[in-house]
Amino acid sequence: MKQEIKLSKEQQEIIDSNKDTIVVSNPGTGKTTTLSLKVIKLLEDKINPEDILCITFTEKAKKEMFDAIYDYGKGKFSDADIMKINIHTFHSFAYNYLLDAGIISGDIVGNNLMRFSILNSFEQNQALNYGKDYIISTIVPKTENSIRYIKSFGITPDKIDLNKATTILEKIFDEKSSSYTIDEMKSFLKYFIEAYKEYEKSKLQAVDYSDMLLMFKEKFRGNKFQHVLVDEMQDMNEIEAEIATMVAENLFLVGDAKQAIFGFQG
């Protein structure tokens, strides 16, 4: 059992609050501890542990969160009750729901398929006047990151209008601060869309991690959790923020004061 922590008046008020709560402070100031103690307070208030969902972003952070909750709760609650608390990454939460609902088969596309599809598309279209080594080491990773980024907003290749995208590029492009010319960027934009299409086609019926979040958002028909707690909430993208709000009756978010804070309606 962890040593009793002396909380400030403000920390105690945060943990005792029954309202949607956002805790923002500098890194290393005990936000995850606050989240863990909030879970313990919910258990003390007789909240069903199965009605508590804790979300973080990596398997390592998930284990650390469980360990902290277990240590603070040891001696107060049974191991069985603590084990009933739902602790997930966003992806494992979406995966488990979709799998249990029979929406996916369990096959998840890995990173290698995306990289191969991007490279294959560039080669087939004889895209970009660069050496293959440079394309593999620099262009493919940038394309991969760009696909993941726009997909996090629910933008699939069929929703991208090349003419509109080109017009926007011309308006925002600053040649002085870019390593590429406007013509190179226009060519890349065209081939980027083709590579994105090639990747989606190559997956066939399989899904990747971004697909899982999109599918969860569209297919979720389950009951809301009474309490949803999110660690490192500044790392949430738009879809993850929507998922957190759609599955929660009450939200408790903790994060660093370095990025935009999400607003919640209601």
Protein language model annotation of sequence segments:
Residues 51-146:
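Conserved P-loop NTPase-based nucleic-acid remodeling module centered on helicase motor cores
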Residues 1-24, 29, 33-34, 51-53, ...:
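Accessory N-terminal region flanking or inserted into the helicase ATPase core
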Residues 33-47, 247:
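Walker A/P-loop NTP-binding motif
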Residues 29-31, 234-266:
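Conserved helicase motor core of SF1/SF2 NTP-dependent helicases
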Residues 39, 57-60, 89-92, 254-258, ...:
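A short beta-strand-to-loop transition that corresponds to the Sensor-1 phosphate-sensing loop
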Residues 48-51, 83, 249-250, 256-257:
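Short glycine-/polar-rich loops that comprise or flank the Walker A/P-loop
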Residues 13, 41-45, 72, 218-219:
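A generic secondary-structure signal
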Residues 30-37, 59, 64:
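Phosphate-binding Walker
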